[in-house]
C-alpha cells in the first residue's frame, strides 16, 4: 500500500496493529489507550509497556516486541511495495525490544534512535536494551539457519561499528563516546528477551572495561 503525503500527515492512518499483548501497556496519542489485541497503531504513537509486554506488527510485516518498562515512539512510517521507497524511523527510549524486519528486507531504510546511539538496519533481527541512564546494548541475532540475519550500523557523534555476525554486540554509554568494539556473546535466544543492560553478559562487561 502506498500512503500519500496527505495520508501520512493524517493521524488516523493505520500503519500496523498490536499482534501480542500481555499485562498492562498503553498507547499514548490524543489520550492514553489501554493496549489490546488488534489495536490500530498510527504514526507518532508513543507505546509504553509498564508491567506488560506488547508486539506490534507493521504493514510490511516487520515486528517490534517490547518487554516490560519499555518506551517506543513511531516517528515515521512509509510502506510501499517497492522496498526502496519505504521508510521506518523509531525512537526507543527505554526497556528491551526485539526488532524483526519484514518486506523492507535488505534495504537500509530503517533507523532507530536511542538516547545514546543511532542504529541503521539492513534486513535483520536484533535486540536493543536501554537502561535508566540511557546506555544502549545492541545484539545482532541469527536467522532460522543460525547465520547472520543482516547488518547493523551503530553510530554516535564519535564513530560507528558494524555488527554482521550472529550474537555480535556493542554498547554505548553516552552519545559523545565511540560504541564499544563488537564482541560475540555466548548466549541463547531464550535469554535475549529478558536481558537487562544493568547486568550485561560477561563478554560485554570485559569489552567495556578495555575501552575505558
Could you tell me what each predicted segment is?
Residues 47-57, 64-115, 119, 143-152:
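Short, small-residue-rich packing micro-motifs
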Residues 9-30:
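Short N-terminal segments immediately surrounding and downstream of signal-peptide cleavage
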Residues 23-24, 52-54, 71, 124-126:
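Generic short beta-strand segments
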Residues 29-43, 48-53:
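N-terminal post-signal-peptidase region of extra-cytosolic proteins
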Residues 20-22, 49, 121:
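Short, conserved beta-strand element in jelly-roll/cupin
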Residues 29, 36-37, 67, 76, ...:
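Short linear motifs in exposed loops
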Residues 30-32, 73-78, 121-128, 132:
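Conserved short histidine dyad/triad with adjacent acidic residue
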Residues 1-11, 33-36, 50, 59, ...:
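C-terminal interaction modules
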